[in-house]
Amino acid sequence: MRRTAISLTLASLLVSSASWAVVHPGVDLTDRYIVVLKKDASPNAAQQVLAAIENQRGAVLFRYQHTLQGFAVQMPLTALQGLQHRFPDIDYIEPDLAVQAMPRGGNKPNNGDSGTSTEPPQTTPWGIKRVGGFVDMSGDDARAWIIDTGIDDKHPDLNVDARSGRNFSRGKPNQTSDGNGHGTHVAGTVGAINNAMDVVGVAAGVTVVPVRVLDNAGSGTISGVIAGVDYVAEAAASGDCANLSLGAKGYSQALDTAIKTAADAGILFSIAAGNSADDASLYTPASTVHPNVYTVSAIDNNDNFAYFSNYGSDVEYAAPGVSVLSTKAGGGTVTYNGTSMAAPHMCGVLLVTRGQPSMSGYAEGDPDGNPDPIVHQ
């Protein structure tokens, strides 16, 4: 059932505290496709396909070399199908689709904004406490790769390695700042510094690396997400964690392959289950199954299963995803809701436990009747 024809509606998996939104439909990008070569295709064969695409005035948007061999291209499908007949090393072609982040109206900013703050110098959010508290990982070699909207590298509560970051969205390759806020919030839950200000993350002070695949409006493409995963596979080390708080309805074989290949190299993945109150197996990358890949549903502070959260057999753990306080782009903190917020709790625990998470209790009211264990250190 998971392997249905692709019909993608990628969105940053965050729910407004005022309106519990669901995924918005993606818009097909005319003449944009993902071309994947067979595993045993030689570098020379890949170069021949690339040259043929360029000779037919096709635009190569991304080239994938670390998790799979292939390209994201813009050219008519009929021309691509002609190339597929000419080059048997082409395994399959799938459409690239536009994606859009969810609205976030109604989220409440906290300290760091104008006016007198009533917050203590540093808050330990309820979600951090629920998964076992924070562990100081300042100076640790492990890193968290935030595949998202970028990260505010000037936020004083985050240890951001912007130099190792990359941009696969609009702008220059090294433009990884966050004009949206989603990625900065995710990064804070993973690793906000224990420094007597704002909040503290699960893996406090761990280095967070921005891999920008969504623009300032929260929009992106499946091809850009694959490019982000492909880069992480090249740059990350075994034991690092990549967080994917995004999702799409349907199945992308290329994205699934990219994640599994990176996971084979020891990179841990934490993936949001989705906010559509639906079976997570119908969404990508939530449906990716691998020992180093963890799909995460959301609970509230009473361990109740969040009614917006996706569910099902592809979900490994539940984590806090309602009224989650974390870092805000531009400084200070803000509260968000969504499985986007649950996944970084998991990522932090994976870093702290070196990929050996535990559990503490179960989500109450899981719609599939098989309650998800709540992740814990």
Regions found by a protein language model. Name each.
Residues 143, 148, 267, 283-377:
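Extracellular S/T/G-rich loop segment that most often corresponds to the catalytic His/Ser-adjacent loop
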